[in-house]
Amino acid sequence: MEIEKLANIEITDEDILWVEEMMGGKVHFDSARVNALKNMDSVDIQAFPGSGKTTILVAKLAILAKKWPYSNDGICVLSHTNVAREEIEERLGNTEIGRKLLSYPHFIGTVHSFFDTYVSLPWLKSNGYEINIIDTELVHSLRWNKLPRNKRYYLERQYKSETICEYRDNIGNIERVKNEETNELLLSVIEKTQKDGYFTFGEMLLYAQKVLKEWDEIPKAIQRRFPILFIDEAQDTDTFQWDLLKKVFNSDGELSI
């Protein structure tokens, strides 16, 4: 599928020579990589680790940033880690193009940080939640230590650990044990710590899931804001994250990648 807002952007041989020089003159793209750089349709590029996929992505982003005609709509680049952002900082951070890519209107970061920034955090703040810490291990430990000693002992005898102290699958749902009093206490501790601003990474995605289910206009607004999406390290994106991405960027049956 051709991405509508890119219809008037063409990547030429001159652009590729320019970006090779921009990246220090140490990169030279062969014909297969040139074809990938010039492609303006949705595509899944698969290659073995170390083959230079992220380098190609950074080069393409640099060219697109140079030609980008929109001041309020941006390019969205997501990855499992911050590898794409780090490579842009390393190769292009001291250039005008690099600074453009790393600032508004573009977004380059992890899947988690994207949904936090544009879905979960705005909803939580608008509903009166303060945000203090988003960290799975720290929040597990905090909640576990808020349980009475006898309840922790009971859970340990059920072969449960600190990881039980978070919502699972949906907001308000937990991994339940046989003792209903313990279940109610777990739910109470989770709810109280969330009111105090403490969330796990997984819970933030669950809130994103909840918001996207309840507010159809949010995916449309995000698509207008980011008409093009790149996903690096796609093989590391789990099923739950893919479902969220498809909910946001898949309005016409295809991801705008």
Features from the language model and the residues they span:
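ATP-hydrolysis module of ASCE/P-loop NTPase motor domains
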Residues: L102, W123-S188, K192-F199
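Conserved P-loop NTPase motor core of helicases/translocases
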Residues: E2-E20, Y129-L147, Y207
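Solvent-exposed, flexible loop/coil residues
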Residues: Y118, E137-L138, E203
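Residue-level detector of secondary-structure transition/capping positions
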Residues: A65, G93-E96, W123, G172, ...
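P-loop NTPase Walker
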Residues: M1-L124
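Short alpha-helical linear motifs
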Residues: H80, R99, I134, L229-F230, ...
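Conserved helicase NTPase motor core
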Residues: I16-P49, E181-I257
